[in-house]
UniProtKB/Swiss-Prot annotation:
The gene is groEL1. It catalyses: ATP + H2O + a folded polypeptide = ADP + phosphate + an unfolded polypeptide. Residues 524-543 are annotated as: Disordered. This is Chaperonin GroEL 1. Forms a cylinder of 14 subunits composed of two heptameric rings stacked back-to-back. Interacts with the co-chaperonin GroES. It comes from the Bacteria.
Length: 543
């Protein structure tokens, strides 16, 4: 079928219309007085959410070109979510503001490529300034406050995260489960997380989130490659009879064996997943032993005379829950306290004996994974709709706390970006010229957009509030919850620097794609075939 081709200004304006629709749908959720969005579902009850990236994923427009604009900005939100775990609404609002300002200049005859260069240079300047303004966080209460702000200023979330951090430390793993009651509860259990995910995406049990979640699984831990199907059968058969899932951790699984596991998983014969072993060399073997001890199983290794093809069911480890993503695996086990404590003491002795700071650091990592545990937040709610919304908010909060630990915190509520506007203008005017300068000034005019929207959602005049904020000290901003100007650090209104930086970088990157677009090629939907003739009328037929 012939394709539709749209050029230059018409193409960019069509993309802009899609971006306008997406940005408005997402922006209503921004700030402490942001509204919820109701998502209609084809099957099941509607979903009520306050999460930018979730809303963005649901928006599909009838016009293909406009929908392409939606898809571009959706990528900015998704990328920010992947990198920082939060800041998706900020990224969307920023990208929208850049596109609006940029297209105005392109329509007036500015060179889009030179504008992009100016925007790129402005991005690098702003990223450096954000890092300079960031403060490191050590106190668990300060870290928890970051999570509360991310979850919409929810005090229950703040208390929950503070308690979790106190119990398992700021580097701890905090995971979410759906609870059985109406109250949200915190439970700290023995657990371990390592940075290896499933070998094949076909192992994912939740296609929407691309996660494999197994309750009460068996765990086979092997320090060798698994090449043959015959090696797997003696393990697969008894596990299938037991009716429980199986997770295999091995150095690698070759094609034939992997195909067998995938086929069994897809046919529903056995709920199974395979994960590559973490670490390298001797350290890999030690980490596999840690996993085996944590789950009450045995490491299948030829050094101990054990092979996969003669492994019994009682040699396998057992876990309460295992969650696997494409990048990581979290094991929650219980009931093996004595063996775990003995292993922890053994690692501590090794740390005392070693003189290498590198080895000591790696031993410390293993110690933290074994003894730190996993904090499990069991999300409770009166209805399923409320639970989904609460879970998304808690997920944002946990991601925000991790980001805060990594790169520190900056004043929240759009303050940082608004205050950087005069700094960027001064730098650009002294450093850049011509259309590169115009590109940087486009960014400067767009930076207050998140603050303006937060103020507007609180019933204030966004432009007036933004101008008043620029006149004040860097840490002072508009508190939309109380309609007052306060010191954001003192008031505990802070954002992770990583979230602010990622939102800025991704918004500017994807906005530049729209500005530099010259042509859009669209494949129209095929028209319905004409109905066949009636009686002997000799109507048209499609062959």
């Amino acid at each position: 079928m012939a394709k539709r081709i749209i050029y230059n200004e018409n193409a960019r304006r069509a993309l802009e219309r899609g971006i306008d629709i997406l940005a408005e749908a997402v922006a209503v959720t921004l700030g402490p007085k942001g509204r919820n969005v109701v998502l209609e579902k084809k099957y099941g009850a509607p979903q009520i959410v306050n999460d930018g990236v979730t809303i963005a994923k649901e928006i599909e427009l009838e016009d293909h070109i406009e929908n392409t604009g939606v898809a571009l900005i959706r990528q900015a939100a998704s990328k920010t979510n992947d990198v920082a775990g939060d800041g998706t609404t900020t990224a969307t609002v920023l990208a929208h503001a850049i596109v609006k300002e940029g297209l105005r200049n392109v329509a007036a005859g500015a060179n889009a490529i030179l504008l992009k260069r100016g925007i790129d240079k402005a991005t690098n300047f702003l990223v450096d300034r954000i890092r300079e303004h960031a403060r490191s966080v050590e106190d668990s209460k300060a870290i928890a406050q970051v999570g509360a702000i991310s979850a919409g200023n929810d005090d229950e979330v703040r208390q929950m995260i503070a308690e979790a951090l106190d119990k398992v430390g700021k580097e701890a793993v905090i995971s979410l489960e759906e609870g059985k009651s109406v109250t949200t509860e915190l439970e700290v259990t023995e657990g371990m997380r390592f940075d290896k995910g499933y070998i094949s995406p076909y192992f994912a049990t939740d296609p929407e989130r691309m996660e494999a979640i197994f309750d009460e699984p068996f765990l086979a831990v092997d320090d060798k490659q698994i090449a043959l199907v015959q090696d797997l059968v003696p393990v697969l058969e008894p596990v299938a009879r037991a009716g429980r899932p199986l997770v295999i951790i091995a150095e690698d699984i070759e094609k034939e064996a992997l195909a067998t596991l995938v086929v069994n998983r897809l046919r529903g014969v056995l709920n199974v997943a395979a994960v590559k072993a973490p670490g390298f060399g001797d350290r890999r073997k030690a980490m596999l032993e840690d996993i085996a001890i944590l789950t009450g199983g045995q490491l299948i290794t030829e050094d101990a005379g054990l092979k996969l093809d003669n492994t019994k069911l009682d040699s396998l480890g057992k876990a309460r829950r295992i969650t696997i993503t494409k990048d990581s695996t979290t094991i929650v086990a219980e009931g093996n306290d004595v063996a775990v404590k003995a292993r922890v003491e053994q690692i501590r002795r090794q740390m005392e004996e070693t003189e290498s700071s590198y080895d000591k650091g790696k031993l410390q990592e293993r110690l933290a994974k074994l003894s730190g545990g996993v904090a499990v937040v069991k999300v409770g709610a009166a209805t399923e709709t409320e639970m989904k919304d609460k879970k998304l908010r808690l997920e944002d909060a946990i991601n925000a706390t991790k980001a805060a630990v990594e790169e520190g915190i900056v004043p929240g509520g759009g303050t940082t970006l608004a205050h950087l506007t005069p700094e960027l203008e001064a730098w650009a005017n002294s450093t850049l010229k011509d259309e590169e300068l115009t590109g940087a000034l486009i960014v400067a005019r767009a930076l207050p957009a998140p603050l303006k929207r937060i103020a507007e959602n609180a019933g204030q005049n966004g432009a007036v509030i933004a101008e008043r904020v620029k006149e004040k000290e860097f840490n002072v901003d508009f508190n939309a919850a109380t309609n007052e100007f306060v010191d954001m650090f003192s008031a505990g209104i802070v954002d992770p620097a990583k979230v602010t930086r990622s939102a800025l970088q991704n918004a500017l990157s994807y906005a530049c794609m729209v500005l530099t677009t010259g042509t859009v090629v669209d494949k129209p939907e095929p028209k319905d075939a004409a109905p066949a003739g009636v009686g002997g009328g000799g109507g048209d037929f499609d062959y």
